[in-house]
Swiss-Prot record:
GO biological process, one term: argininosuccinate metabolic process
EC number: 6.3.4.5
Family: Belongs to the argininosuccinate synthase family. Type 1 subfamily.
Protein name per Swiss-Prot or TrEMBL: Argininosuccinate synthase
Enzyme class: ligase
Native species: Chlorobium phaeovibrioides (strain DSM 265 / 1930) (Prosthecochloris vibrioformis (strain DSM 265))
Quaternary organization: Homotetramer.
Binding sites annotated in the UniProt record for L-aspartate: 119, 123-124
GO cellular-component term (any): cytoplasm
Sequence positions that bind L-citrulline: 87, 123, 127, 176, 185, 261, 273
Alphabetical keyword list: Amino-acid biosynthesis, Arginine biosynthesis, ATP-binding, Cytoplasm, Ligase, Nucleotide-binding
Length: 400
């Protein structure tokens, strides 16, 4: 009888390294290890050798960077999706793509089960499993961290040593870190106290604003229909744009975020994020929208941005609601074409200028000089009609 096969989201860390052996023993199944590359900087060489030596029957490395930028990041940027007005959703955006890649490999490898290494109190378990349910509803999902016998990192290390599983014996960082090209999330350790300022060693890529260059960096970003297409006049692929802005913004201390956020599972958590490129691009994109979108569209889209952010954060990317919102967002982005000039300086992003062939700013209407073309006399009748409802109400209900 052929063994069942389990597709495992594999990072090469302690949890997923011992998970291969644990899953094989518990389910008598072969384990297919899958790693997705979303632009993380951590070492990915040697993962295949490590996975196979640990007991995986096969290993799949899937390069997802281009798809991540074009089909996920740009959609979120166009929508203006910032969870609770702060978080650019780097980790949350990556999870549905990783889960989809897992399902694709699982089907190719004839797997009947999907496994992940998410904890039982975090958001990622929801994101993975809701995506699995959307794309592979008949596959069984395994979450070893919710059921296995290990209660500490030390007990996991003991298991690894007992079964000759190669794991790092260097001092573990006190922080839990997740990284991709759109940003880095940092939690745990002293960061769990919301009154403790993040130690400098918690940050992975950004320069401290105090130590950033004394000379500001000026950068120009061009957009076409809401999507960045060039930096400082140089046309670039999306991946290169993000890499370039990560470099420029990080060295100027831009992109450090500290927030208390509401998790999917009902608790509040303190999160530190580094998102240099995301911070710059969201700022620039929003300013270009101010210039080009009609008032009611601009204001209504701010509500949609929160709905879109919640969809990403809550793990319902593969939903009809997200598809429907994409249609609205794409229509709003047709005039969001132009250039935004910014100054990056010691942790701050400052707007220096913006222009667009679809600008709704009319200087002749806005000016207070003799070039003013606004009909001032029209204001009197407008104000009478605009305030008529309140005037009528006040006549019936006099102010006390």
């Amino acid at each position: 009888m052929q063994k069942e096969r389990i597709a495992l989201a594999y990072s090469g860390g302690l949890d997923t390294s011992i998970m291969i052996k644990w899953l094989k023993d518990k389910y008598g199944a072969d384990v297919v290890a899958i790693t997705g590359n979303l632009g993380q900087q951590k070492e990915i060489e040697g993962l295949e050798e490590k996975a196979v030596s640990t007991g995986a029957s096969s290993f799949h490395f899937v390069d997802l960077k281009k798809q991540f930028v074009e089909d996920y990041i740009w959609r979120a940027l166009k929508a203006g999706a910032l969870y609770e007005d702060v978080y650019p959703l780097a980790t949350a955006l990556g999870r549905p793509l990783l889960a989809k890649a897992m399902v694709d490999v699982a089907l190719e490898e004839n797997c009947t089960m999907l496994a992940h290494g998410c904890t039982g109190k975090g958001n990622d378990q929801v994101r993975f499993e809701v995506t699995f349910a959307s794309l592979a509803p008949n596959m069984k999902v395994l979450a070893p961290l919710r059921e296995w016998e290990f209660t500490s990192r030390e007990s996991e290390m003991d298991y690894a040593i007992k079964h000759n599983i190669p794991v790092s014996v260097t001092k573990k960082s006190p922080y839990s870190i997740d990284e991709n090209i759109w940003g880095i999330s940092i939690e745990c350790g002293v960061l769990e106290d919301p009154m403790v300022a993040p130690p400098e060693d918690a940050y992975q890529i950004t320069t401290s604003p105090e130590n950033a260059p004394d000379t500001p960096t000026v950068v120009e970003i061009e957009f076409v229909q809401g999507v960045p297409v060039s930096v400082d006049g140089k046309k670039m692929a999306g991946l290169d744009i993000i890499n370039r802005l990560n470099e420029l913004a990080a060295k100027n201390g831009v992109g450090r975020l500290d927030m208390i956020e509401n998790r999917v599972v009902g608790i509040k958590s303190r999160e530190i994020y580094e998102a240099p490129a995301a911070t710059v691009l969201h700022f620039a994109h929003r300013e270009l929208e101010r210039l080009t979108l009609e008032k009611s569209v601009f204001q209504y889209k701010r509500h949609i941005a929160q709905d879109y952010a919640n969809i990403i954060y809550n793990g319902t990317w593969f939903s009809p609601m997200r598809t429907a919102l994409d249609a609205f967002v794409d229509d709003t982005q047709k005039p969001v074409t132009g250039m935004v000039r910014l100054k990056l300086y010691k942790g701050n992003v400052t707007l220096l200028g913006r222009q667009s062939p679809y600008s709704l700013y009319n200087e002749a209407l806005a000016t207070y000089t003799e070039a003013d073309s606004f009909d001032h006399k029209a204001a009197e009748g407008f104000i009478q009609l605009y305030g008529l409802g309140l005037k009528t109400y006040s006549e019936v209900h006099p102010a006390k």
